[in-house]
Amino acid sequence: MRLDKYLKVSRIIKRRTVAKEVADKGRIKVNGILAKSSTDLKVNDQVEIRFGNKLLLVKVLEMKDSTKKEDAAGMYEIISETRVEENV
């Protein structure tokens, strides 16, 4: 499944277009490698996402084409969530 679609379906990022923008700005890594929005994700991949001053590391547990809001959190496991200083 494409990275941008997974982030939207799992509700880590609310809209696919926003997921694409974040990836295109170089703020997402998959298994430690800089990723594009079209990167193909697989179960057990680790995705690192930088949201402003927050760094989120999640492990992909499940792939679904669509899901209910209540079930979305079961698609991934949060490994770490840290605050990072902005380089000014």
UniProtKB/Swiss-Prot annotation:
Keywords: Protein biosynthesis, RNA-binding, rRNA-binding, tRNA-binding
CDD domains: S4
InterPro entries for the chain: RqcP (IPR025490), S4_RNA-bd (IPR002942), S4_RNA-bd_sf (IPR036986)
Domain of life: Bacteria
One MF term in the entry's GO annotations: rRNA binding
Gene Ontology BP, a term: translation
PROSITE patterns: S4
Pfam entry (one): S4
Keyword hit for Protein biosynthesis: yes
Domain S4 RNA-binding per the UniProt entry, residue ranges: 1-60
Keyword Magnesium on entry: no
General function of this protein: Key component of the ribosome quality control system (RQC), a ribosome-associated complex that mediates the extraction of incompletely synthesized nascent chains from stalled ribosomes and their subsequent degradation. RqcH recruits Ala-charged tRNA, and with RqcP directs the elongation of stalled nascent chains on 50S ribosomal subunits, leading to non-templated C-terminal alanine extensions (Ala tail). The Ala tail promotes nascent chain degradation. RqcP is associated with the translocation-like movement of the peptidyl-tRNA from the A-site into the P-site.
Protein family membership: Belongs to the RqcP family.
Oligomer status and interactors: Associates with stalled 50S ribosomal subunits. Binds to RqcH, 23S rRNA and the P-site tRNA. Does not require RqcH for association with 50S subunits.
Name of the molecule in the record: RQC P-site tRNA stabilizing factor
Organism encoding this protein: Streptococcus pneumoniae serotype 4 (strain ATCC BAA-334 / TIGR4)
